[in-house]
Amino acid sequence: MQKEQNVRLVLASASPRRRELLSQIGLEFTVMPSTKEENAKTTEAGALVQELSRQKAVDIWEQLSGGQGQNPDADQEQIAEETQEPNLNGKRQPELLVIGADTVVCCEGKILGKPHSREAAAEMLTALQGRSHEVYTGVTLYSQSETVTFFECTQVEFYPMTEVEISEYIDSKEPMDKAGAYGIQGLGARFVKGIRGDYNNVVGLPVGRLYQELKSRGWM
């Protein structure tokens, strides 16, 4: 049985894989991708994905809320209640909650984002083949009443790949819009030797952890 949502969810991402994962666990949401330029000072993977996910969530929340920034010194619970306008039935509208997410691959300390060229994709896959790497996804849940930011890390091991296999995989175009230049849920699965941690985290969103965070705060 599907649990009732107590918030209006907005996904600040254009990723079709994240949309599929949210739908898979029965959440109702709308999509409004953030186009904010990514800008983070840290190069540590866990901190990086958390910061970028927060930037995306804040960007969309401010657009939808009319640019009213969150006041960290205010009584956020009171603000949330006061800003929920009643609908025609006299009931309070659900609180707006924006989900921001960002994923990177980290191989031997080097962060790999999405490849911007065929050459970059080949370089990434060459670095990943035959060894283990980590996939980090940061998630931010941003509302007027509370901000929650966390990340999950999953270890993935690849089989050795030949230059021909790498070239043919890039020909499929699958690597070009994915962190680390591969999709574990697609053709890239043929190169995966093992995984330790949350599979969905590698796809782009640790929905198990996400659901627990929503539930523990009364948003579900």
Which role fits each region the language model picked out?
Residues 4-27:
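N-terminal beta1-alpha1 ligand-phosphate binding loop
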Residues 40-42, 46:
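N-terminal beta-loop-helix "entrance" segment that forms/cooperates
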Residues 30-38:
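A short beta-strand-loop structural module common to alpha/beta enzyme folds
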Residues 3-10, 31, 46-220:
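Anionic-ligand binding patches
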Residues 18, 38-40:
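Flexible, glycine-rich phosphate/dinucleotide-binding loops
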